[in-house]
Amino acid sequence: MSEENPVFQIQRVYLKDLSLEQPNSPQILLEQEQPNVDIQLGVEAAPVADGIFEVAVTATVQTKIKDKTVFLVEAKQAGIFEIRNIPEDQMGPIMGIACPQIVYPYLRGNIADVITRAGFPPVHLAEINFQAMYEQQQSQLASAAPTPGVTQ
């Protein structure tokens, strides 16, 4: 009977990749103008073994003054999850919503920390509604898919 019980366990959360670039330092540090901040997020999921999945949240934080980069941080925080005996129609939401919600706070902390250690005021990533993000991705995929029976 226990073989059929749903299993959802965090095996590990880890920082998979982190890079910081300051291509225009030290000159750019003398600028008085406020930089523009651009933040891009993404979620990836992949099977690792039977019932074991890696879910990663990536973030790119780029600050610029005019057309010059002040700093660029790219980070990928990942988690290994054991997910078994879950109905197939629930796997997408688990890996696209539940797992990223677990991993994301670690990513936020690591990004704020590396930016601060680089000598800049921290950039705090906002809370993310992963359900809305997942639903938007699903609707984009649905609208991009050809309609059955319709030829183009």
From Swiss-Prot:
HAMAP family: SecB (MF_00821)
SUPFAM superfamilies, sorted: SecB-like
Organism: Paracidovorax citrulli (strain AAC00-1)
Protein task: One of the proteins required for the normal export of preproteins out of the cell cytoplasm. It is a molecular chaperone that binds to a subset of precursor proteins, maintaining them in a translocation-competent state. It also specifically binds to its receptor SecA.
Family: Belongs to the SecB family.
GO cellular component, one term: cytoplasm
Entry keyword set: Chaperone, Cytoplasm, Protein transport, Translocation, Transport
Single GO term (MF): unfolded protein binding
Pfam families the record matches: SecB
Assembly with partners or alone: Homotetramer, a dimer of dimers. One homotetramer interacts with 1 SecA dimer.
TM regions (residue ranges): none
Protein name: Protein-export protein SecB
